[in-house]
């Protein structure tokens, strides 16, 4: 998820992620005033003029326990969590190697 000013970095991350993983990946670049786009720490970067992205599993839209007392480890899908993490590691490696001179 990104604001419009960060959409280039969002496209780059999505391309690197999908090249590194078979895990499904969706992206959304939208104006900052769009509901749910700015609901996390990345929006603090936007407010200071920095690009920022949010990687999410859709949080409360997926897990009814999100930010509740019942939000415990047994409500998480660690297999998918690991797949996303592996995809992100691959994506960061691709992006880092592309940035090297």
Model-predicted segments: where are they?
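Active-site-adjacent substrate-binding region
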Residues: 1-101
């Amino acid at each position: 998820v990104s604001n419009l000013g960060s959409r280039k970095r969002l496209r780059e991350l999505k391309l690197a992620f999908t090249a590194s993983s078979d895990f499904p990946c969706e992206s959304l670049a939208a104006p900052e005033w769009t509901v749910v786009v700015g609901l996390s720490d990345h929006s603090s970067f936007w407010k200071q003029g920095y690009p920022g992205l949010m990687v999410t599993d859709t949080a409360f839209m997926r897990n009814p326990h999100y930010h509740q007392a019942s939000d415990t480890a047994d409500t998480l899908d660690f297999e998918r969590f690991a797949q996303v993490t592996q995809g992100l590691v691959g994506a960061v490696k691709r992006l880092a190697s592309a940035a090297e001179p």
